[in-house]
Amino acid sequence: MGSIRQTYIKSTTDALLRQYPNEFGSDFTANKAKVEQLASVQTKEVRNRIAGYVTRKMASKGRKK
């Protein structure tokens, strides 16, 4: 349980990955800084959720190759 994310987290993550595909990697800390730089997020919690989802998607993308 707990792995279902809100729609705005998913849509923001997909938009960021579409616009900036080479900016993100599988490191959460680096992704957190990039999300804060590239997106206007209201709270630290939302920023961390987006960065975590970006990290998860990038890690799974690396495993698929």
UniProtKB/Swiss-Prot annotation:
* UniProt GO MF annotations: structural constituent of ribosome
For this protein, the record's InterPro entries field holds: Ribosomal_eS17 (IPR001210), Ribosomal_eS17_CS (IPR018273), Ribosomal_eS17_sf (IPR036401)
Entry keyword annotation includes Ribonucleoprotein: yes
Gene Ontology annotations for the cellular component aspect, listed alphabetically = cytosol; ribonucleoprotein complex; ribosome
Task: Tell me the superkingdom of the source.
Answer: Archaea
HAMAP family (alphabetical): Ribosomal_eS17 (MF_00511)
The name this protein goes by in its record: Small ribosomal subunit protein eS17
What taxonomic lineage is listed for the species of origin?
Archaea, Methanobacteriati, Methanobacteriota, Stenosarchaea group, Methanomicrobia
